[in-house]
């Protein structure tokens, strides 16, 4: 399960040749945070600020996003939370610099980062939803996941056992195909990312100390 990641940077955005993102977003994202989503509209590729975690039309409590940030590709059609989006082929991508997973060392979880070796951003497959709650338009999205028990890198993460999951990475040369896909059958996209193009390393959270008035971090 991926619950934490860093969105792409401005330099990575420019390297991909994508249009400017017209809103601000956090350097690091967790469930129920806002994040940038790329999708295809009738006008072409567009950015939207969405909630990380699917908020279906029937949900009364927006905090459901804390539980719906990942969606198993195997059960998308069976889960009420994701049915509407998969049936209407609301496919998007979440461009990221790196994402984080828990690796258990001596039965204790450590935070590890996964990223491309070449430093480029990459696209994580997503489903999105748009619904109205009162006078508010709510936009949200979830990362689609796959079984990773046979993936050389991703099988090392998560709690010990036989359940291993991974996000689905959409190759750069299949981006347009994914965003324009018109079928609920997405099996042709369910593939583990090429291990030789990625790397991972221990990435402990940095504790932010209380800022002293005497310190100037811009010097």
Where are these regions (language model features)?
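Short linear sequence motif anchored by a di-proline
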Residues: 1-219
